[in-house]
Amino acid sequence: MSTVTRLNGLTRDPVPQPTTGAKKILVLNLMPNRAVTEQQFASIFAATGFPVTLTFCLPASHQIRRHADQLHAAYATFPEIEDQFFDGLIITGAPLDQKPFTDVDYWDELQEILTWRRTHVQGSLFLCWGAYAAGAVDGVFAGHSIPEKITGVFTVEGYTMPQSRYFLVPLAAIERGEIVAGNLDLGAVIVTDDTTQSTYVAGHFEYSANTLALEYYRDQAKNGDAAPEPQHYFTGDNQYSWTWRADAVAFYRRWLAKITDSQPPAAADTGTALPTIPLTSLAAARRAGLTPWQGANVDTLIYNLTPHTDRVWLLDTPAHHVDLANAWAILHHIQPDIQVIATKEGIV
């Protein structure tokens, strides 16, 4: 089992201690039961073999009806983290399939987040409604809502996962990218777009064994016999099993490995490895796709960069100490041929 550190959230670790080298994942958690969703992601990442640090986020513009104070105390909002860099972004599902996108109270902010992630995140993963919405904004596909719910556990081209949605992405609606899994009945289930390092998943690999059952019982209480029973899920004695767990772990393991092998977003997406403004060591390390090193005054490192990012000045003073060896390693990870000028105690 690998180490998963929850820096915030309703199930936050009491004393978070991130593992050196852990992948930094931002989760925009839009699911109704956020605590359960946090636990589901922690469980699946723990089984991947990759150390992971999770930060949970909410749209600032979302009007939360219940327990708003508790959620805002536990979660970051997008404006609070938008100056940070992450290895991965996950946008979860949300019970919004039957609502027009423009009726979602945080729709404008969600579009802003999707633009932001192209320069601040190495890889993005969109789930269920999150995939439906992101695919439309990104121009990867155009899905549509459907009157009958797709619910159950389905195996498509070797991938077994739960589906729970009121939308369909027809195979013919894919504008770019690759359909990894899909069929005529379920539509595109997994789509990847390498141009933005994005993966769109119509289902819920992260679901626990009982999640579909709980959703079904909830729908029964609301709609009675009209509630559709999940297909290929319940056994004859009304039990269920976690038939997708192995596929889920394998999927997330591959996703984390792909993030590890990819370039930092600033180098890959903007054509400029670093901006021409000073950065703290923390921001530079995140931009390089590395975990910031531990040490005193680590955030006082000053980077002065030329417009072409071919030279960097490191200033080390008694008041603001810089670990030059680690700074050098980070800079050469970003730009192997970069020229580094080090100034110590005011003397070049």
Positions of PLM-derived features:
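Short glycine-/acidic-enriched loop or helix-start segments at secondary-structure transitions
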Residues: T37, R66, P100-F101, A134-V137, ...
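Amide-donor transfer/coupling interface in amidating biosynthetic enzymes
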Residues: M1-L58, Y75-I81, F85, E112, ...
